Regions:
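Hydrophobic/aromatic-rich core segments of domains that either
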Residues: 2-5, 116, 120-136, 145-156, ...
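Secondary-structure boundary elements
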Residues: 3-160, 390, 395-544, 554
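A short, amphipathic beta-strand motif
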Residues: 270-281, 595-605
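Short, acidic Ser/Thr/Gly-rich low-complexity loop/linker segments typical of extracellular
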Residues: 295-317, 620-638
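Short Pro-Gly-centered beta-turn/loop motif in secreted/extracellular proteins
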Residues: 311-325, 329-331, 340-343, 632-657, ...
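Short active-site neighborhood of thiol/selenol oxidoreductases, capturing the structured segment around
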Residues: 710-735, 751-754
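Thioredoxin-like thiol-disulfide oxidoreductase module
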Residues: 761-801
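Thiol/disulfide oxidoreductase modules built on the thioredoxin-like
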Residues: 784-830
Length: 833
């Protein structure tokens, strides 16, 4: 007779050991946790201990035991009731079924609820089948919506019905884990071919990982709109919170989180070697090497490594350009080196460290060109659904969209209504009532979808005594407002107030800077126990006596507001400020900006910060981009007060094929110096802008409904495909440009294909006028439900912006694309033809 399975037999001892270590470090917090664990079954208690052993300190401080109990109980039940789950390797079960955290989202109970909603739909399915079905359920409940940087909990995404890609994937991973399908979020931290990033989901079955688009169901795995885009990535990563790292290439850490390289599943890769040497030419062991891509006009890290005893660091990456920098500290002095490497043509590079203080010694300050190449489009995942699967999927997706749209129609957070409708019984409550709408109004749109009435009630009740002591706008925004940064909105005012005597409160009001002194003494930062982007709430800091630097700054604002002092984090640099004599003053003395940089724009380029230029300062062996606020060029001049030191200006011109023409300008500026620099954007030749992208076959319709293959339409020479949105400004612009150059475009009219939704579109004023002038243009029809998205994604332009314009040269060979309206599109099309 087979022995009964023992829950987490292989990992039991290390879980207990790590849990005891956490409890030893935070005894006050863990005493009540231990009491509650004694009331749990042995398996549930062990599951809870695993969560507590490997969660960030911020989670321990932010959330009550009952939140994690939901994850533990659901995980144990899955292990007991589902043989597929029980058969999983323990490390897979622990990290990708049981664990509560996906990335940096708010944590809330959801697993038991999701399992109840989904369970019956996947009865009898294997993991592969279940993953596909769960993703249809996710599409029924949520879709993409651009929002702010705070990451919603999975249950909040479900309730409001939308989220950005990072939130959709958090939601989908939780849904999958809730029914026992091992799942994780993966990220392209920065694309190389465009200024953006993306997150999606991987599921584990049959001993390997497969991917899917979160809330974007397909009939097969390893298929998503990003399949081609991911083949052009230089890095795709996953993360692990456990200290026992599974097999894979470690590409860096973020506090307690380990980042793993997942690129081989998506792109053609190679291993590169970086050798770092000191000024004497000897290997530099322990140098930090940062691998970076140019994105949003700054070099953004995608992986970090340390050199070995031979001074080398190795990375598996894609075939494109990387900016590689190295730094090392010796006897308190920082040394630095950097280069650009095209990994398609180079296997290794060498960096020689120099003192950062001598970075520009002897160098004439000038612009230096850098050509940045994006990897070529080379998908390694080429599976496609059959026509039958595609038809089935389209039908199901239409039904999912209808279900979701019905669900979210007129939806609002009932907690907001509850807060607004609270009964007013006393005179002092009548005053508070007048501020209820003000409090909701000062919150973000996202806050209003997941805020909790009881939390708002405490903030209102304890802030109201200060309402008459300052201007109303100041009171509402900087005293009443519960939101400081991107922290989880929770109660904290009552807990803060009870920590101080009446005398202490008055002393802190008289000199708010003393609040920071108290925080520095009482709250310890343990970065090795945190995830830098996960904030410990003010109440969590007080409970655990720990918090990151950002968490402590938020705590400062929270304490100040609780005591009736208007306070904030400066919106440009997150520095702490409180109001004194009607203006905000810094808590910590800022480094003096003792010199001035005058930037000249020239007359031909519209400069946009973090779009085509940026400036960074070299400190501690690393360039850090400045966070410019409302500074704008006036009369082609921008005056920037700076701290003295070494700087690097970057300008970048993103080409349609994803490559970039970059320009770098390194300079040193001395105290009291005024320096003038003219920004220079490198121009591109036509041949630099063209691509050769194989587009999928698609069908268009003639006026009588006959289907025509796009391969037939694009067979001979060059053509311009234009998907038009009649009477909308971007489409009107390009039509007007074409009519202004009527004679030139008339010569190519037979090679121009207008695609519209209906015959009625042809009767609108501008479009009918354009067709009258350019008589031989071909007209075809499509409902724009699918082809627009497919072609836009394939050509690496935004499919949500019309008109979509594609120039082809040969059968289904796209050489240029643009979407929306861009000045000069008409001229560009003529150049291409």
């Amino acid at each position: 007779m087979a022995e009964p399975r023992v829950f987490l037999k292989e990992n039991r001892d290390r879980i207990e050991e790590n849990y005891l270590e956490q409890a030893k470090n935070l005894p006050r917090v863990f005493a009540p946790v231990d009491e509650k664990l004694q009331k749990c079954t042995e398996e549930v208690a062990l599951a809870c201990k695993y969560l507590y052993a490997f969660m960030p300190y911020s989670d321990i401080g932010n959330y009550p035991f009952e939140v994690f109990l939901d994850y533990a109980e659901n995980g144990v039940r899955l292990w007991k009731e589902n043989p597929q789950v029980a058969d999983l390797p323990e490390e897979i079960f622990l990290n990708y079924v049981l664990f509560h955290r996906v990335n940096e989202e708010e944590i809330a109970q959801c697993r038991t609820y999701f399992r109840a909603e989904i369970g019956s739909r996947i009865q009898g399915m294997n993991f592969r089948e279940a993953a596909l079905e769960v993703n249809y359920w996710c599409a029924e409940e949520a879709t993409y919506h651009c929002t702010d940087d705070r990451t919603l909990s999975a249950i909040s995404v479900y309730r409001r019905g939308n989220g950005r890609c990072g939130e959709e994937s958090v939601f989908t991973v939780n849904a999958l884990r809730s029914v026992g399908v091992p799942a994780r979020q993966v990220y392209a931290p920065k694309w190389s071919h465009c200024d953006d990033n993306h997150a999606w989901v991987e599921i584990w079955c049959d001993g390997k990982w497969y991917f899917l688009g979160a809330c974007e169901p397909e009939e097969i795995l390893n298929k998503g709109w990003f399949t081609n885009a991911s083949s052009r990535a230089m890095m795709i990563h996953s993360r692990v919170f456990d200290t026992k790292i599974p097999e894979g290439e470690v590409i860096g850490t973020d506090g307690m989180v380990t980042m793993l390289n997942e690129l081989k599943r998506y792109a053609v890769t190679k291993e590169i070697t970086v050798t770092v040497k000191d000024a004497q030419g000897l290997p530099s062991e322990g140098a930090e090497v940062s691998f970076e891509v140019l994105n949003y006009s700054e070099y953004a890290p995608i992986a970090e490594k340390k050199t070995d005893s031979k001074g080398t660091a190795r990375l598996t990456t894609g075939l494109g350009s990387l900016h590689i920098s190295a730094r090392m500290c010796s006897d308190g002095e920082w040394f630095y080196a950097e280069t650009v490497m095209n990994t398609e043509k180079e296997d290794n590079c060498e960096l020689c460290l120099v003192s950062q203080d001598k970075r520009n010694d002897g160098e004439s300050e000038k612009w230096t060109a850098a050509d940045i190449f994006a990897p070529h489009d080379a998908p390694v995942n080429t599976d496609m659904p059959t026509l039958e699967q595609k038809a089935k999927g389209n039908k199901r997706l239409t039904a999912a969209n209808a279900h979701r749209e019905q669900k979210v129609r007129n939806w609002s957070n009932p907690e907001c209504e509850r807060f607004l409708e609270k009964k007013v019984n006393r005179i002092e409550e009548a005053i508070a009532a007048s501020y209820r709408e003000d409090l909701l109004r000062v919150l973000t749109e996202k806050d209003r979808t997941d805020c909790i009435s009881d939390v708002l009630e405490e903030h209102l009740e304890l802030a109201i005594p200060y309402h008459g002591m300052m201007k109303k706008d100041t009171f509402v925004s900087y005293v009443l407002n519960p939101r400081v940064d991107d922290e989880v909105l929770q109660k904290y005012r009552r807990e803060i107030k009870k920590h101080f005597s009446r005398t202490e409160k008055q002393e802190l009001r008289d000199d708010p800077s003393r609040i920071w002194n108290l925080i520095e003494k009482a709250i310890v930062s343990r970065p090795e126990k945190e995830r830098s982007s996960v904030i410990t709430t003010p109440a969590g800091c007080i409970r655990t006596c720990t918090g990151s630097f950002l968490s402590k700054k938020i705590l400062f604002v929270a304490i100040a507001r609780t005591l009736g002092v208007a306070a904030r984090l400066n919106p440009h640099d997150r520095s702490m400020e409180y109001m004194k004599n009607g203006r905000f003053v810094p808590v910590l003395a800022r480094t003096e900006k003792n010199c001035t940089l005058i930037l000249k724009a020239g007359e031909t380029v519209q400069w946009k910060y973090f779009q085509n230029w940026s400036i960074a300062k070299l400190e501690n062996g690393r360039y850090t981009s400045l966070k410019l606020g409302a500074e704008n060029f006036e009369d082609q001049i921008l005056n920037l007060p700076l701290e003295s030191g070494n700087y690097r200006i970057l300008t970048s011109n993103r080409l349609p094929n994803g490559n970039m023409f970059a320009n770098e300008y390194h300079f040193e500026i001395q105290p009291g110096e005024t320096k003038e620099i003219e920004l220079v954007l490198r121009e591109a030749d036509l041949e630099d802008m063209l691509e050769n992208i194989s587009m999928p076959e698609f069908m268009l319709k003639t006026e009588d409904g006959t289907e025509v293959k796009a391969s037939d339409l694009t067979a001979d020479g060059k053509h311009i495909l234009m998907f038009l949105e009649e009477e909308k400004e971007p489409t009107e612009h390009i039509l007007n440009e074409m009519m202004e150059q009527e004679e030139a475009f008339a010569g190519y009219a037979e090679q121009i294909i207008f695609v519209v939704r209906s015959k009625e579109a042809l009767e609108t004023p501008t479009l009918s006028k354009a067709l009258a002038k350019l008589k031989n243009i071909q007209i075809y029809y499509d409902d724009f439900s699918e082809i627009i998205n497919t072609l836009g994604r394939r050509m690496y332009v935004d499919p949500d912006k019309l008109p979509l314009i594609i120039v082809t040269n040969g059968i289904l060979n796209g050489i240029y694309a643009t979407s929306g309206y861009n000045v000069g599109t008409g001229d560009m099309l003529l150049r291409l033809m």
